[in-house]
Swiss-Prot record:
Keywords: Ribonucleoprotein, Ribosomal protein. GO terms for biological process: translation. It comes from Bifidobacterium longum (strain NCC 2705). This is Large ribosomal subunit protein bL34. The gene is rpmH. GO terms for molecular function: structural constituent of ribosome. HAMAP family: Ribosomal_bL34. It comes from the Bacteria. Belongs to the bacterial ribosomal protein bL34 family. InterPro entries: Ribosomal_bL34, Ribosomal_bL34_CS. GO terms for cellular component: ribonucleoprotein complex; ribosome. Pfam families: Ribosomal_L34.
Amino acid sequence: MKRTFQPNNRRRHMKHGFRLRMRTRSGRAVINRRRAKGRKTLSA
């Protein structure tokens, strides 16, 4: 059986990237929550 995680940076950024987060209201909320929490990385 093959592993489920096959790393791919392009797919990672397309699905979980900063620009994708900024597109929707809830995505922006995610970024703001992570900023408030003091996360070093806000998104993929």
